[in-house]
């Protein structure tokens, strides 16, 4: 199973990027997590651009989503919200209408912040957007609060409880992919 991990932060060595790398380390056998690093190549959503030609950064994101079995979002929180660059990427990936690269693609969300609540509002905002885009999403909310205290000096996720939560989330994502694939197969057979 191939999962595209999208880190919502543009900052180098961000907490979110470290958590995304930890998720790849914790992935169940047979699950490959590929890190997406093109968020900064996606222009602000503009329907005029969509009508002319899809920008190269958007085309790359769409192709990588379409080549994946699932998507993993790892997001920080800015002012009680998901980062604009991440929301912008979701907007582009869901367009044009009727051709969403997110529709039907299973997803899981991890939010992480140095604040105690672990960016839970950002995670909930992305979950809400995925409801609209038709993206089946794991119900488990993984919000890693005080993430700065849970990462080791080498960048690995050292906190056992956080590791267990991420591991459980990835197992549930794998189950969701199986369910979606089974439903699609049944629709084709009908």
Language model region names:
Residues 1-31:
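N-terminal beta1-alpha1 ligand-phosphate binding loop
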Residues 3, 16, 20, 42, ...:
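A general structural signal for well-ordered alpha-helical segments in protein cores
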Residues 53-133:
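Helix-loop-strand module that forms the ligand-binding subsite of alpha/beta enzymes
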Residues 4, 136-190:
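Glycine-rich phosphate/pyrophosphate-binding loop and the adjoining helix
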Residues 31-44, 136-145:
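Short beta-strand elements in bilobed, periplasmic/extracellular small-molecule ligand-binding domains
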Residues 38-55, 153:
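N-terminal beta-loop-helix "entrance" segment that forms/cooperates
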Residues 8, 38, 112:
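Cofactor-binding loop segments of dinucleotide-utilizing enzymes, especially the Rossmann-like FAD-
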């Amino acid at each position: 199973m191939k999962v595209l991990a999208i880190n919502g932060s543009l900052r180098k060595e961000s907490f979110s990027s470290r958590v995304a790398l930890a998720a790849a380390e914790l992935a169940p056998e047979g699950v490959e997590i590929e890190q997406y690093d093109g968020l900064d190549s996606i222009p602000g959503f503009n329907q005029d651009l969509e009508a002319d030609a899809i920008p190269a950064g958007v085309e790359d994101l769409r192709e990588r989503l379409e080549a994946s079995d699932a998507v993993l979002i790892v997001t920080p929180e800015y002012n009680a919200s998901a980062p604009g660059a991440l929301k912008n990427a979701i907007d582009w990936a869901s367009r044009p209408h009727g051709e969403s690269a997110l529709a039907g693609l299973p997803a899981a969300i991890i939010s992480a912040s140095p604040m105690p609540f672990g960016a839970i509002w950002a995670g909930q905002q992305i979950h809400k957007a995925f409801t609209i885009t038709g993206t089946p999403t794991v119900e488990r909310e993984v919000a890693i609060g005080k993430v700065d205290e849970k990462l080791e000096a080498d960048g690995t996720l050292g906190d056992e409880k956080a590791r267990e939560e991420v591991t459980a989330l990835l197992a549930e994502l794998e189950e969701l992919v199986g369910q979606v694939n089974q439903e699609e197969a049944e629709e084709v057979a009908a």
